[in-house]
Every structure is written in C-alpha cells, then in structure tokens.
Design a protein with these regions (language model features):
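Short, solvent-exposed, Trp/other aromatic-anchored flexible loops in extracytoplasmic proteins
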Residues: 97-150
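Short beta-strand elements
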Residues: 152-165
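Short, surface-exposed binding/anchoring microloops in extracellular/periplasmic proteins
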Residues: 37-97
C-alpha cells in the first residue's frame, strides 16, 4: 500500500514537471508591427494588406501578415530574401513561398538577386504584402543572403527569427 502511494505521488510530481514543457505555443504577434534590425537590415512584420484577391486569415489554420525588409547599411550587389516557418516536433523548416510562376528556382536567379539589390540600394524596401503563416508554427524565420559591392565573391547571410513568447 505504501509503495502504491509513493508511486502515485511520484507519478503526479513528474506529470506536473513534464506536462508544462510539452505545451506548444502558436506564433502570434500580439503587438504589430514588430521589428528586428542589424547593421545592414531592418525586418518588420506587420498586419497583412487586405483587399480583393488577397488571402484572408482562416481560424484554426493560418494567420496572414506582411513583411518589409529595408537595407539600412552599405550598398549591396545582389540580395535574396527567404521566409521559413517551423513545424512542431520537427527540425525541418518550411519555405513560405515557392519559385515565381512555379519556374525552376535557379533559372534567372542571379538576375532577380541583382534587381532586388538595385531596388534596396535605391531606398525601396522589399515588401511582401500578404503571406500565410500556419497557426501551428512557433517560429518564423527571415533569411537574407547578399553580396556586398566590392566583395562580390563572398556571400553574406543574416537570419532574423521571430518566436512565440
């Protein structure tokens, strides 16, 4: 009888310690806009643009947001912006968008990177006005890969991670 009581108490104790750590939180931005910056980049997540033809949030499935990336540092020769979300219980990150027009990702890749860099250097931000983020995601990652003018052969990368609090 004493062994059963001790076992029951130990089990309850362990459940109180382990159960809260298994709780997952969905990534929601309580306060928008939210911004992260570095010496080179400013990354801001805000409310999604609304309008005809734009996707709307769907309760229980996904939220919608907008993203704005500004070059606040030195001029760049080429730039790429990638967005990822996580999947609970997985180390794999999932891209939030595919290649333009379902084309091969590497085709015209360099030309797009140079075109984006030119716009960023001219003070125009990269703006993604309406993107989906699954409710089950607990992490949103923006990865920027660029080459600096004068250092063309060496790509640089920064990652901005927004997590559930």
């Amino acid at each position: 009888m004493v062994k059963k009581t001790i076992f029951a108490i130990c089990t309850l104790f362990l459940l109180n310690i382990v159960a809260p750590t298994l709780e997952t939180k969905a990534l929601t931005f309580d306060k928008l806009p939210t911004k992260q910056t570095s010496k080179q980049w400013s990354v801001q997540v805000d409310k999604a643009d609304q309008g005809k033809g734009l996707v709307k949030p769907e309760k229980g499935k996904f939220h919608t947001y907008s993203l704005e990336v500004d070059n606040i540092g030195k001029d760049v020769l080429s730039a790429e912006v990638h967005m990822f979300r996580n999947e609970p219980n997985s180390t794999t990150k999932f891209s939030l968008f595919s290649c333009p027009d379902e084309k091969e990702c590497n085709k015209e890749h360099f030309e797009r990177a140079i075109s984006l860099a030119d716009k960023l250097n001219d003070g125009y931000p990269y703006r993604f006005s309406n993107f989906l983020l699954a409710e089950k995601a607990t992490e949103f990652e923006v990865e920027i890969i660029w080459t600096q003018k004068g250092m063309e052969g060496r790509p640089l990368k920064e990652t901005f991670t927004f997590t559930a609090e």
